[in-house]
């Protein structure tokens, strides 16, 4: 009986290998695209990714083979062509268009910067970062800066040699009085931060001519929240900031002192309190205090994240522990739309090219939501792979399809929303690469199972085109990983 099965299987394999199909190989990346004169090619339907990759390399005349991935109708080919045709009911008489892209290059560990306490937030200033482009500034290669906000209440600016260029002042001199959970560059000379002391603080940042030392100087203290602040978003062209707070509200602020209203008196520390907390120096520290342009109140639980629409800064989005994603008109401070889900939403990122918002959840997955009122379903796709809460998200600067997530399971995962399958839960995506904490590897515990990511929880991740993937968390480190062109550009 086994012999009959084996011969039948062999015959089927032989038949599939002998079948042929016309394929049109295309690429959106000009540097690897075949000449337009390259027409459809007749290939065996038994070909898989490796054989197709060899074929493309031969057609391109590459001396050094480049690994490629292949997509049909926007989805990765994970089987033979024959199996794909059968599964999708497509005739082998059809000319099949197959798109090829560079395969994933695993992001390698570049460096780690050690802190004295947990690191709650990271951001990058580079030639390709938003803060640089907004200011029409220039950051030369090697002069990139990394900003960290720590649970010790201090901001630090680092160079790429893991040296601290500047540290923010103590509470006595205008610094934060509690843990920092969010910090961002507004421009090469301006920083904003917030945390558990309920304040949003604006800072001036300057460096010496040689770039070896710098100064973070307090500029404005913004009061309005009645509980800790979990995240920040900035839009420098409009001089606006969004803050997400555990007091269930979103703060909408101006970076310009002249535009901002007075700070609420009931939230500003009294003069007596301030003088007792701040030691006397040659001249007492006097920092302007301002209030919010608006407080957006509709959520019924802590707000985890608030961001600007990438293409329209008058639109904002927020996520909350109340399971909802909300859309706001920032001009009128009005609630526009509410999308309710089944889980607490802990992080948020915009994928504008696909009209999607990525939301990290307490249920260990990422839900992609179409915020447009015309959308008929709440969840467009679910990304699964993490084993604990997903608390930070950052889009891939190289590809509109890419995303990275940071989780309390101690990993960052790279996603390509084209890498999907369909099951009982609908369209489900799987991560294409997982980045573990270097601190575990150095302890010889890279394969150790950490319950809930104990000791290595990731709190923040930022993906920068120039610097790479920068993450930070409970292991008191910033970690930098880089893989050139991790996903295809598109």
Curated annotation (Swiss-Prot):
Keywords: Nucleus, Repeat, Ribosome biogenesis, rRNA processing, WD repeat
Pfam families associated with the record: NLE (PF08154), WD40 (PF00400)
WD-type repeats, residues: 129-168, 175-213, 224-263, 298-338, 340-379, 385-425, 453-490
InterPro entries: G-protein_beta_WD-40_rep, NLE, WD40/YVTN_repeat-like_dom_sf, WD40_repeat_CS, WD40_repeat_dom_sf, WD40_rpt, WDR12/Ytm1
The keyword rRNA processing belongs to this UniProt entry's keyword annotation: yes
Record carries keyword rRNA processing: yes
GO CC annotation terms, alphabetical: nucleoplasm; PeBoW complex; preribosome, large subunit precursor
SMART domains to which the protein is assigned, alphabetical: WD40 (SM00320)
Main location group: nucleus
Record localization: Nucleus, Nucleolus; Nucleus, Nucleoplasm
PROSITE patterns: WD_REPEATS_1, WD_REPEATS_2, WD_REPEATS_REGION
GO biological process entries: chromosome organization; maturation of 5.8S rRNA from tricistronic rRNA transcript (SSU-rRNA, 5.8S rRNA, LSU-rRNA); maturation of LSU-rRNA from tricistronic rRNA transcript (SSU-rRNA, 5.8S rRNA, LSU-rRNA); protein-RNA complex remodeling
An example Gene Ontology molecular-function term: ribonucleoprotein complex binding
Location of region: Disordered: 257-285
Region: Ubiquitin-like (UBL) domain, residue numbers: 21-102
Domain of life of the source: Eukaryota
Role this protein plays: Component of the NOP7 complex, which is required for maturation of the 25S and 5.8S ribosomal RNAs and formation of the 60S ribosome.
Quaternary state and interactors: Component of the NOP7 complex, composed of erb1, nop7 and ytm1. The complex is held together by erb1, which interacts with nop7 via its N-terminal domain and with ytm1 via a high-affinity interaction between the seven-bladed beta-propeller domains of the 2 proteins. The NOP7 complex associates with the 66S pre-ribosome. Interacts (via UBL domain) with mdn1 (via VWFA/MIDAS domain).
Family stated for the protein in its record: Belongs to the WD repeat WDR12/YTM1 family.
Protein name listed in UniProt: Ribosome biogenesis protein ytm1
Protein species of origin: Aspergillus niger (strain ATCC MYA-4892 / CBS 513.88 / FGSC A1513)
Lineage of the organism: Eukaryota, Fungi, Dikarya, Ascomycota, Pezizomycotina
């Amino acid at each position: 009986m086994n012999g009959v099965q084996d011969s039948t299987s062999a015959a089927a394999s032989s038949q599939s290998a002998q079948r042929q199909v016309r394929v049109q190989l295309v690429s959106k990346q000009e540097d690897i695209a075949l000449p337009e004169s390259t027409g459809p090619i007749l290939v065996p339907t038994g070909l898989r990714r490796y054989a197709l990759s060899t074929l493309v390399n031969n057609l391109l005349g590459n001396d050094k083979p480049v690994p490629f991935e292949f997509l049909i109708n926007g989805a990765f080919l994970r089987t033979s062509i024959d199996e794909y045709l059968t599964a999708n009911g497509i005739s082998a008489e059809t000319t099949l268009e197959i798109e090829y892209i560079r395969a994933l290059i695993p992001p390698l560990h570049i460096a780690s910067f050690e802190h004295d306490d947990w690191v709650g937030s990271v951001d990058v200033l580079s030639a390709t970062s938003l803060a640089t482009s907004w200011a029409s500034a220039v950051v030369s290669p090697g002069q990139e800066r990394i900003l960290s906000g720590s649970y010790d209440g201090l901001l630090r600016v680092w160079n790429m040699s893991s040296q601290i260029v500047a540290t923010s002042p103590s509470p006595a001199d205008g610094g934060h009085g509690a843990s920092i959970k969010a910090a961002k560059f507004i421009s090469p000379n301006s920083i904003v931060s917030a945390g558990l002391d309920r304040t949003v603080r604006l800072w001036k940042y300057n460096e010496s001519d040689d770039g070896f030392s710098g100064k973070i100087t307090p500029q404005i203290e913004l009061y309005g929240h009645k509980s800790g602040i979990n995240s920040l978003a900035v839009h420098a062209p409009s001089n606006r900031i969004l803050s997400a707070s555990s007091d269930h509200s979103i703060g909408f602020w101006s970076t310009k002192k002249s535009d901002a209203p007075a700070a609420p008196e009931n939230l500003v520390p009294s003069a007596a309190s301030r003088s007792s907390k701040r030691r006397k120096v040659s001249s007492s520290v006097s920092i302007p205090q301002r209030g919010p342009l608006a407080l957006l109140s509709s959520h019924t639980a802590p707000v985890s994240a608030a961001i600007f629409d990438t293409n329209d800064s008058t639109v904002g989005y927020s996520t909350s522990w109340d399971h909802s994603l909300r859309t706001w008109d920032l001009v009128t401070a009005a609630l526009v739309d509410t999308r309710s889900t089944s889980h607490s939403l802990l992080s948020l990122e915009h994928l504008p090219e696909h009209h999607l918002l990525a939301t990290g959840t307490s249920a260990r997955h990422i839900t992609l939501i179409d915020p447009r009122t015309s959308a008929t379903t709440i969840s467009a796709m679910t990304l699964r792979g993490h084993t604990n809460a997903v608390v930070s998200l950052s889009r891939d600067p190289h590809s509109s399809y890419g995303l990275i997530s940071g989780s309390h399971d101690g990993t960052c995962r790279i996603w390509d929303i084209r890498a999907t399958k369909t099951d009982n839960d609908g369209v489900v995506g799987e991560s294409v690469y997982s980045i573990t904490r270097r601190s575990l590897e150095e302890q010889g515990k890279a394969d150790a199972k950490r319950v809930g990511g104990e000791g290595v929880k990731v709190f923040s991740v930022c993906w920068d085109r120039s610097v790479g993937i920068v993450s930070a968390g409970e292991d008191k480190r910033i970690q930098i990983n880089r893989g050139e062109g991790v996903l295809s550009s598109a």
